């Protein structure tokens, strides 16, 4: 589980809670921020619209469950991916491309394994690139469906919050005879806006951005795999392949890999 995401969500809730209970009425003031009707309008309305936008109810449930992906730690590290490819290039250089089939059995990543098998089968390099890039596009499209789901819900929350506020204001204006009810009724009307803003900024926007960040990382790593595998197929030197793949990385990450490689070489010596 990605602890950062969980801690962030919990911290947001704690900050809102503290903002409420540190007011003049302390814990008693918490009751002012609860209104069942406002919850029905904001949450129920926004969820209903998201169901309408979904291809099916099953797809809606699937998109809701994608929140688990935001909680998942991205296992593929840049340095690890590059080292795996360099190891494969060394195997291919010493034993030939066909030896990669046995090496593929120890690879957990399905995308990398598929690319290796294409090389072993002797597929044309341009066709290899086309097949792998097509799969990359399909992965990106699937991920973007989940990202857009949460981004769209982030827009629906405040919109339905405003609808609830307008409903509350209409009810308030119909009861203007009793001036003592204006303040409480106005407060209730504003709660739907608060709920909508919390739904968007506490949950939907952060989840959408986290999924987007995870997708960008995964796509970048798979692009590294594509270039690495095609370089192996072309018979390039492992050192050349390593330097080529490092060009995908930030300078700080490259430096980290160089330091780790230097430490490993020192240990072997």
Give a label for each model feature.
Residues 7-10, 14-30, 137-214:
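Helix-termination/interfacial motifs at the ends of transmembrane alpha-helices
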């Amino acid at each position: 589980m990605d602890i950062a995401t969980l801690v962030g969500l919990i911290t947001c809730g704690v900050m809102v809670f503290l903002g409420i209970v540190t007011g003049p009425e302390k814990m008693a003031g918490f009751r002012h921020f609860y209104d069942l009707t406002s919850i029905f309008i904001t949450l129920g309305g926004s969820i209903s619209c998201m169901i309408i936008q979904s291809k099916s109810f099953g797809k809606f449930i699937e998109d809701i469950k994608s929140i688990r992906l935001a909680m998942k730690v991205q296992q593929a590290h840049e340095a690890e991916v590059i080292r795996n490819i360099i190891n494969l290039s060394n195997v291919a250089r010493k034993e030939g491309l066909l030896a990669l089939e046995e090496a593929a059995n120890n690879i957990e990543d399905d995308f990398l394994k598929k690319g290796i098998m294409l090389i072993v089968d002797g597929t044309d390099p341009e066709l290899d690139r086309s097949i792998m890039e097509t799969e990359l596009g399909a992965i990106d499209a699937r991920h973007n469906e989940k990202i857009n789901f949460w981004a769209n819900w982030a827009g629906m929350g405040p919109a339905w919050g405003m609808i609830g506020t307008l409903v509350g204001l209409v009810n308030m204006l119909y009861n203007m005879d009793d001036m003592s009810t204006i303040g409480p009724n106005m407060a209730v009307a504003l709660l739907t806006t608060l709920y909508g803003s919390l739904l968007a900024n506490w949950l939907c926007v952060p989840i959408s951005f986290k999924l987007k960040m995870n997708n960008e990382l995964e796509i970048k790593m798979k692009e590294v795999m594509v270039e690495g595998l095609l370089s192996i197929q072309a018979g390039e030197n492992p050192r050349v392949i390593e330097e080529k793949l490092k060009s995908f990385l930030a300078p700080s990450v490259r430096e980290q890999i160089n330091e780790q490689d230097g430490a490993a070489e020192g240990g072997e010596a």
